[in-house]
Amino acid sequence: MSKRDFYEVLGVGRDASEREIKKAYKRLAMKFHPDRNPGNKEAEASFKEVKEAYEILTDGDKKAAYDQFGHAGVDPNRGGGGFGGGADFGDVFGDVFGDIFGGGRRGGQRQAARGSDLRYNLELSLEEAVRGLTKELRIPTLAACDACDGSGAKKGSSPTTCGTCHGQGQVQMRQGFFAVQQACPTCHGRGKIIKDPCNKCHGEGRVEKSKTLSVKIPAGVDTGDRIRLSGEGEAGEYGAPPGDLYVQVSVREHAIFQRDGNNLYCEVPISFSKAALGGEIEVPTLDGKVNLKIPAETQTGRMFRMRGKGVKSVRSHAVGDLLCKVVMETPVNLNERQKELLREFEDTLTGQSKKHSPKAEGFFDGVKKFFQDLNS
């Protein structure tokens, strides 16, 4: 009977992280454990299958061989060999089989893995991003077990030397005339075995935990910026260095301002009379309202630049500008008197539209030329 795919056994994808694989294993191991299913042969077989899949997929060397060659890559009996002692053939065949069996090591036990890096997505308002602030972040992570100080062994005990590999972390596997090294299947390449595991972390040396960090967000950050906090990732295996935490910044859209680099943009409505006669209008900035002088005969869509009213660069002392686009609004809900005044004003423009409407002049001249060209 052929073996099932190890990823299928654990119910995880081929891109699953080691943490996801461990979670799946713990859940299935509890489900099929013989103590919970006394006398159930099917559950016992499933438990062994789950255990084998876990041992392969959490060992870097075996996982690499399995991903490349399937079950044949991790079968110790393939080629009539097996595990055993003897001379160290790693120097001779390490370069040949290194890629297959995760080689490159000239003997010696596998180093405990550095902790995984973590990513935290932080959403900020535009005001927070521009001014900077300190944020309290709650981070779910794997922390070193405080009951065993990350060793995985119960207090008062310590890991013992593996009897299979004699502390080397590797064993010989024979392939016909060849012999190659791979991680010891008993200790998973560590060279030591925990016979009396810690009750709190169950020999893992790490426990799931949430921690709170106070993170300073510098002024001027923008969407896509990343803040690295060294050593604040997951704890490493059995005392290995921790990973890092990366805070990924995104900035929410603002109701008034749009940001482009260090510059801010906004649209400011102005009345018809203000655009024609000129005057001062109030313009919003992130520091409060300021007055902007509008010259007479301002056309809708004109852009005004207010220097130094943008965003301070997070990488230098440069400060961007605020660009205000004025948009002339057509008056609504007019009373009869106001309508009458507008009609009188319109009458005064009769025959003088070119003089008072420069854009209209250009438009109608263009229309006239279009029809002339069409009929020529």
Curated annotation (Swiss-Prot):
The entry's free-text remark on the cofactor is: Binds 2 Zn(2+) ions per monomer.
Positions that bind Zn(2+) 2: C162, C165, C184, C187
Zn-finger segments (CR-type): 132-210
* Chief location: cytoplasm
Q: Which cofactor does it need?
A: Zn(2+)
What molecular functions are annotated in GO for this chain?
ATP binding; heat shock protein binding; unfolded protein binding; zinc ion binding
Chain ranges of the J domain: 5-70
Keywords assigned by UniProt, alphabetized: Chaperone, Cytoplasm, DNA replication, Metal-binding, Repeat, Stress response, Zinc, Zinc-finger
> Which Pfam families did the record assign?
DnaJ, DnaJ_C, DnaJ_CXXCXGXG
Q: Is Protease one of the keywords?
A: no
What InterPro entries is this protein classified in? Answer: DnaJ (IPR012724), DnaJ_C (IPR002939), DnaJ_domain (IPR001623), DnaJ_domain_CS (IPR018253), HSP40/DnaJ_pept-bd (IPR008971), HSP_DnaJ_Cys-rich_dom (IPR001305), HSP_DnaJ_Cys-rich_dom_sf (IPR036410), J_dom_sf (IPR036869)
Q: PROSITE patterns recorded for this chain?
A: DNAJ_1, DNAJ_2, ZF_CR
Per the record, the domain of life is Bacteria
Where in the cell?
Answer: Cytoplasm
| GO CC annotation terms, alphabetical | cytoplasm
An example of a Gene Ontology BP annotation on this entry? DNA replication
Question: Which PANTHER family does the record associate with it?
Answer: CHAPERONE PROTEIN DNAJ, DNAJ HOMOLOG 1, MITOCHONDRIAL-RELATED
Query: Which HAMAP family does this one have?
Result: DnaJ
Its domain comment says:
The J domain is necessary and sufficient to stimulate DnaK ATPase activity. Zinc center 1 plays an important role in the autonomous, DnaK-independent chaperone activity of DnaJ. Zinc center 2 is essential for interaction with DnaK and for DnaJ activity.
Record note on quaternary structure: Homodimer.
Q: State the similarity comment.
A: Belongs to the DnaJ family.
Q: What is this protein called?
A: Chaperone protein DnaJ
Q: What is the species of this protein? A: Shewanella halifaxensis (strain HAW-EB4)
Tell me the name of the encoding gene: dnaJ
